[in-house]
């Protein structure tokens, strides 16, 4: 009573998304496996390529590490950089470390870092 792979695939293709999720969970329990992708295993193999990719990085994130001793000035600087409201900027500053801006150019990241450091913040560009 062997079931062909095609029959299994046809049956699965007619299932709802929730049914497929439940099926995957049941298979994980029955066979003691996980359907999660092994991302960490692939990372070491790309070690040599990662060095070259780091040199070509074009998008940067500006992260507020701490607001230092002048929180009000840092909040004002964050508001002018991000166009956030007062409450949102205050929450961002008080929630340090937190990203101020993400996916920006190197020049823009350096300019934002300069503005925030002048206001008294500790900044990290990633």
Curated annotation (Swiss-Prot):
Which keywords describe this protein according to UniProt? Ribonucleoprotein, Ribosomal protein
SUPFAM superfamilies found in the cross-reference section: ClpS-like, Ribosomal protein L7/12, oligomerisation (N-terminal) domain
This protein's GO CC annotations = cytosolic large ribosomal subunit
- Superkingdom classification of source: Bacteria
One Gene Ontology molecular-function label: structural constituent of ribosome
Name its GO BP terms in alphabetical order. Answer: translation
Subunit details for this protein?
Answer: Homodimer. Part of the ribosomal stalk of the 50S ribosomal subunit. Forms a multimeric L10(L12)X complex, where L10 forms an elongated spine to which 2 to 4 L12 dimers bind in a sequential fashion. Binds GTP-bound translation factors.
Name the protein family. Belongs to the bacterial ribosomal protein bL12 family.
PANTHER family (UniProt xref): 39S RIBOSOMAL PROTEIN L12, LARGE RIBOSOMAL SUBUNIT PROTEIN BL12M
NCBIfam families listed in its UniProt record: L12 (TIGR00855)
Q: What does this protein do?
A: Forms part of the ribosomal stalk which helps the ribosome interact with GTP-bound translation factors. Is thus essential for accurate translation.
Q: What name does this protein carry?
A: Large ribosomal subunit protein bL12
Q: Which organism is it from?
A: Nitrosococcus oceani (strain ATCC 19707 / BCRC 17464 / JCM 30415 / NCIMB 11848 / C-107)
